[in-house]
């Protein structure tokens, strides 16, 4: 069955679901044990777990036809407000976690809270428990850069030159990202990484334009999944990895090669999931709620640490962020997804009750 005969946004939700599961895994223990076999699960998902979100954003991107400022305002609203709102909520939990002993720090003073709130409002940080906040910085900046390049190149009347200029400018921006990342140039809002990810947006954009209607047979998806998985494992075995927060991108060629292979790995996996309605329902649901999972999964990790300490009474250090006990990796993975979903449901219920209360007293 061809992809275009179903809702394409659902397929993208599946990809985002794969991505958010990978992010939760990546922020948990990097190495897990099955019997005597050690699996480098963290380094593996780090090869693609951010690139897939930028691919999805490029896929969902719609050309700016008229007003660039309207586009910029919409994107800022759609990314800035949700990230800011949930970051402030996560900040409120910090002193509670200090009291519980799951964070090794002193209580935030009024001055500290004021600084953190200011940083959150200005996109300079998401508070101590929101370790993934920088992702929203680079996603917002890269989309704004990509949209601006597309808008200005669209002013060229000749379609051939328009496309050439668009692709060349995106390539130049990506090259700046490679250079600044290799030189460890820490720009404001992590712009060095935003530059780096603009070409990934282009890949998603071009995929939707030219390949999204292509028919993928199950056999082809399975073969591609095995091939891409094997290549990624080969990179890991040879000590080649990607960790953008540490400026680790292997090399200019390898970064984009690995990103493309990782995206193909996720796309082939999503194509297989797409054939199973029950799996599609679950994974696409996670994709639609990826923002909340992104924000609250570390909060969930620390809840696991606290409960483990209380129930077992083991003398362990539970104050490390994002997690404290490597042996609890299965629980981190599960609760890192379930707890954020429960938090979202709780917050939605509070908002709904507040609205009903206001209507009742009007």
Task: Name each model-derived stretch.
Residues 1-362:
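Alpha-helical transmembrane segments and their immediate juxtamembrane cytosolic regions
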């Amino acid at each position: 069955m061809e992809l275009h005969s179903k809702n394409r946004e659902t397929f993208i939700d599946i990809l985002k679901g794969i991505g958010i599961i990978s992010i939760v895994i990546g922020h948990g223990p990097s190495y897990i044990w099955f019997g005597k076999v050690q699996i480098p699960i963290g380094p593996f998902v780090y090869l693609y777990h951010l690139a897939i979100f930028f691919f999805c954003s490029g896929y969902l991107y719609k050309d700016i036809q008229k007003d660039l400022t309207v586009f910029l305002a919409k994107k800022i609203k759609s990314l800035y407000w949700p990230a800011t709102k949930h970051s402030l909520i996560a900040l409120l939990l910090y002193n509670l976690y200090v009291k519980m002993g799951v964070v090794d720090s002193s209580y935030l003073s009024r001055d500290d809270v004021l600084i953190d709130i200011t940083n959150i409002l200005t996109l300079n940080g998401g508070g101590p428990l929101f370790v993934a906040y920088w992702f929203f910085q680079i996603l917002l900046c890269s989309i704004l850069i990509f949209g601006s390049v597309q808008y200005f190149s669209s002013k060229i009347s000749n379609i051939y030159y328009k496309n050439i200029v668009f692709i060349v400018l995106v390539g130049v921006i990506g090259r700046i990202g490679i250079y600044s990342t290799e030189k460890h140039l820490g720009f404001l809002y992590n712009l060095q990484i935003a530059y780096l990810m603009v070409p990934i947006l282009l890949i998603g954009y071009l995929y939707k334009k030219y390949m999204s209607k292509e028919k993928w047979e199950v056999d082809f998806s399975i073969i591609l999944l095995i091939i891409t998985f094997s290549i990624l494992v080969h990179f890991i075995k040879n000590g080649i990895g990607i960790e953008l927060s540490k400026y680790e991108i292997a090399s200019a060629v390898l970064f984009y090669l690995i990103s493309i292979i990782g995206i193909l790995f996720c796309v082939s996996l999503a194509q297989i999931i797409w054939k199973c309605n029950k799996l599609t329902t679950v994974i696409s649901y996670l994709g639609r709620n990826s923002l909340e999972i992104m924000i609250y999964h570390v909060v969930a990790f620390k809840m696991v640490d606290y409960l483990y300490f209380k129930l077992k009474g083991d003398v362990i250090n539970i104050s490390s962020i994002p997690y404290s006990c490597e042996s609890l990796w299965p629980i981190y993975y599960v609760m890192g997804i379930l707890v954020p979903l429960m938090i979202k449901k709780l917050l939605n219920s509070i908002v709904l009750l507040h609205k009903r209360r206001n209507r009742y007293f009007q």
